[in-house]
UniProtKB/Swiss-Prot annotation:
Record-listed cross-link Glycyl lysine isopeptide (Lys-Gly) (interchain with G-Cter in SUMO2), residues: K159, K171
Residues in coiled coil: 10-54
Encoding gene (name): INO80E
Protein name: INO80 complex subunit E
Region Disordered, residue ranges: 59-187, 222-244
Cellular compartments per GO CC: Ino80 complex
Amino acid sequence: MNGPADGEVDYKKKYRNLKRKLKFLIYEHECFQEELRKAQRKLLKVSRDKSFLLDRLLQYENVDEDSSDSDATASSDNSETEGTPKLSDTPAPKRKRSPPLGGAPSPSSLSLPPSTGFPLQASRAPSPYLSSLASPTYPPFPSDYLALQLPEPSPLRPKREKRPRLPRKLKMAVGPPDCPVGGPLTFPGRGSGAGVGAALAPLPPPKMPPPTILSAVPRQMFSDAGSGDDALDGDDDLVIDIPE
């Protein structure tokens, strides 16, 4: 009876011990992870400092190389000037040039067009013809021409203000006073405040010409023989002198 009870107690102790060890391992794992993060931060900071220092070092090296190159070129220039003899003391004899032929153009006047890939070197002494083309001389402008000034542009005309349109009044023809007037016709005005209408009268009938009465026409107009007292009888004897 005591055997199985002792075995059960041993399993419980083992379980508790294993559980305690597991908690301890988890705690150690977290501590090591924190230490690892700190070490990574330090490593990143060191790498940044290293790159910054390398850049500064390269700048100083470039400055040193430039100064050494300038010293070397200065020393080489001094050695060349000391080793070469003075040419100004012994001038070289001038060669006689043959006069150019009339038909053959001089090589200095010929100018080849520059190519896009290989540009030609500029000549040392430009010809007088090219210099005259480069800078042509013009007579100065007269003072009267320079004194003239362009007329200033006229300012823009101001826009006219739009006036409000007034209501139009009706114009109706009124008949003559001698015509009979019928009843007045009233029309309302177009304005809001116009309440009085204009009195209009009907148009009178058209007047017909009076009938011709044949009895009123004098009989002398229908007679063939005229009276002797007419003022136009003596026109037949009128003579007109036309100068030649």
